[in-house]
UniProtKB/Swiss-Prot annotation:
Catalyzes the interconversion of 2-phosphoglycerate and 3-phosphoglycerate. The active site is at residues 9, 87. InterPro entries: His_Pase_superF_clade-1 (IPR013078), His_PPase_superfam (IPR029033), Phosphogly_mut1 (IPR005952). Belongs to the phosphoglycerate mutase family. BPG-dependent PGAM subfamily. It comes from Streptococcus sanguinis (strain SK36). NCBIfam families: pgm_1, PRK14115.1, PRK14117.1. This is 2,3-bisphosphoglycerate-dependent phosphoglycerate mutase. It is an enzyme of class 5 (isomerase). The lineage of its organism: Bacteria, Bacillati, Bacillota, Bacilli, Lactobacillales.
Length: 230
């Protein structure tokens, strides 16, 4: 059976500060760095050997991927980066403290923005310091593709082509795959893999640690799902 390991990035500096992060390129905290290393140690203990790795274009996921591969003695494994694995874009909430946002907009509204499947948060201004429209890493993309805000539905729509074009074919070829990504891009793919309803995915949380493992048969039916070390 082939294995797919999802590792959400370790705690970031903005996770630590309770800020909405989204596409802002925030670094790992000291705790997050250790979580990434510990993820790699769990992978090594489990004897999982990868053939291919994928990650986003955000440093917290890239570093988590590299640290986990290094700690599992697999730093040589090819890594492909894609914006399609980025975190959900939190729009105008980016950089805001979650508690302060609740005070400003109300607990219920912020909860809807965070947890609903298809409600968009406010758009980010194009001149915002965190706007992806002026970020060089997205220069090859058509400007119309770059989001100003996303919900989980939109996140799945842009992550799904990467699943279909890259991850699923690798698994079908018998390759074990590592994906170092983000809470919501992983949630989106888990929704697709498990065929969860829009309501069911609302209750799914992806922790910074430990990694989540799916084992598939040759037709990519899920045979087993578990968290490493649990």
């Amino acid at each position: 059976m082939v294995k797919l390991v999802f590792a959400r990035h370790g705690e970031s500096e903005w996770n630590k500060a309770n800020l909405f992060t989204g596409w802002a390129d925030v670094d790992l905290s000291e705790k997050g760095t250790q979580q990434a290393i510990d993820a790699g140690k769990l992978i090594k203990e489990a004897g999982i050997e990868f053939d291919q790795a994928y990650t986003s274009v955000l440093k917290r996921a890239i570093k988590t991927t590299n640290l986990a591969l290094e700690a599992s003695d697999q730093l040589w494994v090819p890594v492909e980066k894609s914006w399609r694995l980025n975190e959900r874009h939190y729009g105008g909430l980016t950089g805001k403290n979650k508690a302060e946002a609740a005070e400003q907009f109300g607990d219920e509204q912020v909860h809807i923005w965070r947890r609903s499947y298809d409600v968009l948060p406010p758009n980010m201004d194009r001149d915002d310091e965190h706007s992806a429209h002026t970020d060089r890493r997205y220069a090859s993309l058509d400007d119309s593709v770059i989001p100003d805000a996303e919900n989980l539905k939109v996140t799945l729509e842009r992550a799904l082509p990467f699943w279909e074009d890259k991850i699923a074919p690798a698994l079908k070829d018998g390759k074990n795959v590592f994906v170092g990504a983000h809470g919501n891009s992983i949630r989106a793919l888990v929704k697709h893999i498990k065929q969860l309803s829009d309501d069911e995915i609302m209750d799914v949380e992806i922790p910074n640690f430990p990694p989540l493992v799916f084992e598939f048969d040759e037709k990519l039916n899920v045979v087993k799902e578990y968290y490493l070390g649990k």
